Curated annotation (Swiss-Prot):
It is an enzyme of class 2 (transferase). This is Glutamine--fructose-6-phosphate aminotransferase [isomerizing]. The gene is glmS. Residues 280-421, 454-596 form the SIS domain. One of its GO terms (biological process) is fructose 6-phosphate metabolic process. InterPro entries: GATase_2_dom (IPR017932), GFAT (IPR005855), GFAT_N (IPR047084), GlmS/AgaS_SIS (IPR035466), GlmS/FrlB_SIS (IPR035490), Ntn_hydrolases_N (IPR029055), SIS_dom (IPR001347), SIS_dom_sf (IPR046348). One of its GO terms (cellular component) is cytosol.
Amino acid sequence: MCGIIGIVGKEPVADRLIESLKRLEYRGYDSAGVAGVVGGKVERRRAQGKIKALEAVLADEPLTATTGIGHTRWATHGAPNVRNAHPHTAGRVTLVHNGIIENFAELKAELAGMGRTFESDTDTEVIAQLIDVALAKGLAPLDAFKATLDRLTGAYALAVLIQGEADLLLGARRGSPLVVGEGQGEMFLGSDALAVGPFTNRVIYLEEGDYVALDHDSRRIFDASGARVERPVRVVPTSSVMLEKGNYRHFMEKEIHDQPEGCQRTIAAYVDTLTSKAAVPGDIDFATLDRIQIVACGTSYIAGVIGKYLIEQLADLPVDVEIASEFRYRTPALRPGSLVVAMSQSGETADTLAALRYCKAKGMKSAVVVNAQESTMAREVDVVWPIHCGPEIGVASTKAFTAQVSVMIALAIAAAKARGTIDAAEEQRLVKVLLEAPRLIAEAIGLEDAIKEIAADVAKARDVLYLGRGPMSALALEGALKLKEISYIHAEGYAAGELKHGPIALVDDQTPIVILAPYDSYFEKSASNMSEVMARGGQVIFITDTEGVKHAPAGAKVVVTAPASDPLVSTLVMSAPIQLLAYHVAVVKGADVDQPRNLAKSVTVE
């Protein structure tokens, strides 16, 4: 959600903090700030808006520190303004933070009861206050830091300065990435290797729960228990630091694991976390629309189909979804009162761009759901809805897909509220459900070891079928697409109700049948399809949730139990198992996971 940089050394750091923050702009942000230890005191410079606004502040008020931290912020708790911009200070402590502290309200109330006052609306300031309280009790900086970490619930990456400690930089991570960079007579902290890439090619990827104390020429790393540990130093060519996989074997694996943070960043851009209301950017009056026309290709098309289910269900607004390469070569019946929504990770997909231009020529208002905000589509539409998931390197889309679906969910809520099909209470409930999705996705990713075992058998198959009902029928298409893209196994996805209309002829004891069935209104019908498949010797891989597993018919070869979720976000939660299955099947088969044959990341030709 945010970008972090920290430097401890012997030379002024302000210019390099800014340089690093510019490299982190791809992550998205609405404010920026830096801080440094000057003459034993910590000084801050902050600005709302782009980094150039922060540079203007620094031009008027230079920062001469040799130890400093920097941050680009996407608002989660608190409005996007200077008061809520990082770094945040409490007493002797100044810090920057990426993540969400789930128990901040409880901690803030406790601190307020101690007479502590707050200058911002953020959850981050609570962390600074807790560290300062511990320091006031006489704890050493590192001990005060650890005592605070033990009290936090949620996700964080932190970089911390302490007043009077000009040669100390503290860092920690849980749920959000953080790296250490080793330089000559200086050390660095960063959100990723890209952040420290201009200054060093020696990078340490902190593991979950690690915290670290840096001075200009040494590092001390501790695990979550407080034990001193060593982590491997990786030499990362600075020319290719953007393409760094960290400790993962493939970009696809990394990007699957990036999804909790990625979706959190996406969702934060489309809802107000303080009021639990939808806050979709752009000038679109959903109340006056008579129809939405979605055009897309590949995985983006499937995300659009999921969007159709949700928008029609919640907002009673008709939605058509078409494959752009088909749409553009027929004569669709279009109306000026409709909205065309193009969906494309790159914003350059040729067929989608052509379909978008066709609709615009018919007088339709236009929007794009896109990752690349400077792309052709983004420049040509009336409204841009960015997905904010950061660079996606693997050809088979994972985090961009779930980010697109996250945007579609937010759009569905906003449209429903605008059209009066839900009231304020239901809007708040739905937004809270959406805000829970990143945590549930992380839990689903935790099924990876079990899915690895399944992959060994699936890798032997010649064909695989995926079945689902409702939005899960779209996810069945996505599961099949992922598997065929990277493992080269023939796979097909079907609406489970179509089973008896043809696909059941393919069922035998050699063909794995993946059935996606969370415990929702479609579950009983999906369970019936499962029984039909098993009666014919089909090898069922049943992907359900903690409620569905209680009601599933016996006989499945394998049952994968994802966390239970509201139907609003079940496609997000169930995406992780199908992505991991495709990934590990491809690994077993020795396929080129990140660059599968014949495929390109951005399809810019017809």
